[in-house]
Amino acid sequence: MDVRITIETTFDNGEKRTHQLDGISRPYRVTCPDGIGLRLEDGKRILEQIQRVILYDQVDEIIRESRVCPDCASVRAIHDYRTRVLDTLFGRVRVKAARLRRCSCD
């Protein structure tokens, strides 16, 4: 048996993004009791992937919305990208986040 795990993110602007996570494979002939259901290491791996996908999409949406200047509504340029480390309940996640230039109206 093969199990596929897919996450679909729907952003506030209506855009949808689909992420394919690792799957789980189980033989149909189970030889021991721990071969039935989800194993602890499977659960940890899948939870880590879910957390990473959610964080990446959240950071992407925050940056996309922050690029629009709240005063003049022009789109601010991206200065560069930096790696950020976010500490979550389920561990640390590294994300690549844009640094934005100041708007000319400031």
Explain the meaning of each model-derived region:
Residues 1-104:
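Short, conserved DNA-binding cores of transcription-related domains
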